[in-house]
């Protein structure tokens, strides 16, 4: 049976639950809920974990409890515990440099300034792992763009208007993940990267 390891990036705790930076958590929680599976804390993996099957595939979902900037600690623990190849993991992460609702599936790449990805790259000593980036848009410019604006934006709560867009994104990504072992990866990459949030 094929096993897929999905790791959503975010910050634990109610304070950050609905923040833009927690899109990785929110998407995987939506996926897990669809299959009536609950997340359980596993200290050895430094994550909350959920598991379910779709056809002949076992999906293992992880929400690191390390906080975003130390996400690599959890990913390292997961990789070591399950003794898996890096091509079996897929990271779900927010991206402030992509327009709201835009999806980018990449097989490898730099952190792009994202501290969660930076931590993973440092722990794994490679950039060669798959990731799905979900756009949250840039912070509004007031008196010129500044660092504080960026922090406030990514840690700010998702608005109702944003949620209506992101719900479409979650559905699209989940639908593609469900087919990850029945369709060629290139097809799924193209499907996600061409997603248009404005289509009905």
Curated annotation (Swiss-Prot):
Q: Which reaction does it catalyse?
A: an N-acyl-L-alpha-aminoacyl-tRNA + H2O = an N-acyl-L-amino acid + a tRNA + H(+)
- Do you know which Gene3D superfamilies this protein is assigned to? Peptidyl-tRNA hydrolase (3.40.50.1470)
Q: What is its EC number?
A: 3.1.1.29
InterPro entries per record: Pept_tRNA_hydro (IPR001328), Pept_tRNA_hydro_CS (IPR018171), Pept_tRNA_hydro_sf (IPR036416)
One of the record's GO molecular function terms: peptidyl-tRNA hydrolase activity
Name of the top EC class for this enzyme: hydrolase
Positions annotated to bind tRNA: 16, 67, 69, 115
Alphabetized, the UniProt keywords read: Cytoplasm, Hydrolase, RNA-binding, tRNA-binding
- Site entry: Discriminates between blocked and unblocked aminoacyl-tRNA: 11
Active-site residues annotated for this sequence = 21
Name one process (GO BP) from the record: rescue of stalled ribosome
Gene Ontology cellular component terms for the protein in this record? cytoplasm
Cellular location of this protein? Cytoplasm
Q: Does the keyword Endoplasmic reticulum apply?
A: no
Chief site of localization = cytoplasm
**Keyword match Secreted:** no
A Pfam family per the record = Pept_tRNA_hydro
The UniProt site entry described as Stabilizes the basic form of H active site to accept a proton is assigned to 94
Subunit details for this protein? Answer: Monomer.
Which family, according to the similarity comment?
Belongs to the PTH family.
This molecule's function is given as: Hydrolyzes ribosome-free peptidyl-tRNAs (with 1 or more amino acids incorporated), which drop off the ribosome during protein synthesis, or as a result of ribosome stalling. Catalyzes the release of premature peptidyl moieties from peptidyl-tRNA molecules trapped in stalled 50S ribosomal subunits, and thus maintains levels of free tRNAs and 50S ribosomes.
What protein name does the entry list?
A: Peptidyl-tRNA hydrolase
């Amino acid at each position: 049976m094929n096993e897929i390891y999905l790791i959503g990036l975010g910050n634990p705790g109610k304070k950050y639950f609905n923040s833009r930076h927690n899109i990785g958590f929110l998407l995987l929680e939506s996926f897990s809920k669809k299959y009536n599976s609950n997340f359980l804390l596993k200290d050895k993996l430094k994550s909350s974990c959920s598991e379910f099957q779709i056809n002949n595939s076992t999906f293992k979902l992880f929400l690191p409890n390390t906080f975003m900037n130390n996400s690599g600690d959890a990913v390292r623990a997961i990789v070591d515990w399950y003794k898996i190849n890096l091509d079996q993991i897929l990271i779900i992460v927010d991206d402030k440099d992509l327009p709201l609702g835009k999806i980018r599936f990449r097989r490898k790449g730099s952190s792009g300034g994202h501290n969660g990805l930076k931590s993973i790259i440092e722990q794994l000593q490679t950039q060669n792992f798959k990731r799905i980036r979900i756009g949250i848009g840039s912070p509004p410019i007031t008196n010129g763009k500044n660092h504080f604006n960026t922090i406030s934006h990514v840690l700010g709560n998702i608005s109702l208007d944003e949620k209506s867009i992101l719900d479409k994104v979650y559905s699209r990504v989940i639908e593609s993940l469900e087919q990850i072992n029945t369709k060629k990866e290139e097809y799924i990459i193209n499907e996600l990267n061409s997603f248009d949030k404005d289509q009905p």
